[in-house]
Regions:
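Cytoplasmic C-terminal tails of single-pass
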Residues: 501, 507-516
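Membrane-embedded alpha-helical bundles of multi-pass enzymes
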Residues: 2-206, 404-405, 416-420, 431-439, ...
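Soluble catalytic domains of enzymes that build or remodel membrane lipids, polysaccharides, and related
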Residues: 203-473, 477
Length: 516
């Protein structure tokens, strides 16, 4: 009895270590090698689990070991951003982490159904399909962890991060299936080598295209305004003066200034000129993109938005964009329209309305800025729609004071830089406190500001208008993995490898009685 218990505990420990390896790559980008084999224990044990229940538990262990440490900053976000008491924030995080672990449990269930003889491509297909379909609040993908391997990032222009996730999962599965079988390992290793060589070639080609595009200088201003200062009405003029001063220090004046999200916390009417404080901004020839809480009337009642405004060189509003993808528990409370009493749990949570759709801010005939507000630069589909609307430059404005100096800042940028590669556009990110940066179309960070310091920097960008395969085809590769998983998993037999010499898998169910 003791030996099976020890064996089970050892298996769960290895599963937890695999999950922790993935988490480490998201907590410390330099730990990216750990992510390559993070799925190996799950792929090794789930197909061989004695029962489906055991496989599900295996998945939950690996999933919790990934989600709990990697995204623990969500506790602080829910507590400070949503205004929930700390015990409530911890409860919500426990629910979110457990929900995220269900992705691993789903994959484990599929692997258990297929059994050990499943095709070696089944596990990576199932994992990639789960990444695409599973509704994680923070939309991380395994491939996102490889930020520092620039040649591999270039696959983003073809199909986003999914081919890289697939290749990483394929290698992990090959290692645990037959670690000494060179033929099994050769295919994923060769695929990764091809992606690396192709990516190196594409970096050179894209750099040449960028050199031919029109230059456009963007001034990013990071005010380092804390939450208390930001919400204090009496400090508003002082805060704006800080942004003015930092902007004046940029010489020569840039073609565009970008200030962070909700620089103006009180409501700006959609049809008004800028507030007098912003209208008096020195250096009027420079257009300005800034964030503000705004409102308009709908059936006589005010409706509130989280907005980005373009102030023209003449001091008048020349465009606006209202955030579409709102953060639950921060900008709205889910189901509060059905159960209004939910608002009493967090009076500080906003009551914003989503905007109508993607938009561009026309700074000039060539400079069409695609505004993204905070979380929106994590969403590939939303950013592609913004580029489809005509954006030649992407600009994120964010208020990251809620996160403090946590892993959230690095993870946000780690995911966001993929949008530059996927669309071959420059991406500038103006944040309130941390990690304001500029990213070029191959994913390099070309400019960045220090954490929790007031500073400004001029980023030399180029205006690009080309279309990538990912923009044209969307998530075709991801959908292919979904269809492949469904086809292979339609029955245990369908998921089995047809490779010569593959032994049949063990039968499940009640064993047949033999004759005495």
């Amino acid at each position: 009895m003791r030996r099976p218990v020890i064996r089970r505990l050892a298996r769960r420990l290895l599963l937890a270590l695999g999950g922790a390896a993935i988490a480490s790559a998201f907590l410390r980008p330099a730990a990216w090698p750990l992510a390559w084999l993070g799925l190996a224990p799950l792929f090794a044990f789930a197909p061989r689990a004695a029962t489906r229940r055991d496989a599900i538990v295996d998945g939950l262990v690996a999933g919790l070991a990934t989600n709990v440490p990697a995204f623990f900053w969500l506790v602080q976000t829910i507590h400070r951003f949503g205004g929930f008491p700390l015990p409530v924030a911890l409860f919500f995080y426990a629910v979110l982490a457990t929900f995220g672990a269900l992705q691993f449990a789903l994959v484990a269930t599929l692997l258990h159904r297929a059994g050990p003889p499943a095709s070696i491509l089944f596990a990576p297909a199932a994992w990639t399909a789960s990444e695409f379909l599973f509704p994680n609040l923070f939309p991380w993908r395994l491939g996102h962890s490889q930020r520092d391997l620039l040649p591999l990032l270039q696959v983003g222009e073809l199909a986003g991060p999914y081919p890289l996730s697939f290749a990483m999962a394929w290698l992990a599965n090959a290692v645990v299936r037959r670690p000494l079988d060179v033929r099994r390992l050769a295919a994923p290793v060769l695929t990764i080598a091809v992606l690396w060589c192709w990516g190196t070639w594409r970096i050179d080609r894209v750099d040449r295209e960028v050199e031919q595009a029109p230059p456009f200088t963007v001034g990013i201003v990071q005010g380092n305004v804390g939450l208390g200062e930001k919400r204090h009405a009496a400090r508003f003029e002082d805060n704006v003066e800080r942004y003015r001063r930092l902007s004046r220090d940029l010489a020569p004046p840039p073609d565009l200034l970008v200030w962070p999200e909700t620089v103006v916390e009180w409501g700006v009417p959609h049809d008004s000129d800028p507030p007098s404080e912003l209208d008096a901004f020195p250096g009027a020839p420079t257009p300005l993109v800034f964030g503000a809480v705004s409102w308009s009337r709908r059936k006589g009642d005010p409706v509130w938005y989280n907005s980005a405004f373009l102030r023209g060189a003449d001091g008048r509003l020349r465009g606006a964009y209202d955030k579409i993808v709102l953060m639950p528990f921060g900008e709205f409370i889910p189901f509060a329209s059905t159960w209004p009493w939910l608002k009493t749990l967090s009076p500080a949570t906003g009551d914003f309305t989503p905007g109508a759709g993607p938009a561009v801010l026309d700074v000039s005939p060539r400079a069409k800025v695609g505004p993204l507000i905070c979380y929106e630069d994590l969403l590939s589909g939303h950013v592609r729609a913004t580029v489809d609307a005509g954006a030649t430059l992407l600009a994120t404005i964010a208020n990251d004071a809620w996160f403090g100096d946590t892993a959230a800042l690095h993870q946000h940028e780690m995911l966001a830089l993929w949008r530059a590669v996927e669309n071959r556009r420059f991406l500038v990110r103006a944040t309130n406190i941390c990690l304001s940066s500029g990213v070029d179309p191959v994913g390099r960070r070309v400019a960045n500001l220090p954490v929790e310091k007031e500073a400004a920097i001029a980023v030399q960008t180029r205006l690009l208008d080309g279309a990538t395969p990912y923009r044209r085809l969307g998530d075709l590769f991801a959908w292919t993995t979904v269809l492949a998983t469904a086809w292979l998993a339609r029955s245990p037999r369908g998921a089995r490898s047809d490779a010569p010499g593959t032994p049949p898998g063990p039968r499940r169910g009640r064993p047949r009685r033999g004759r005495a």
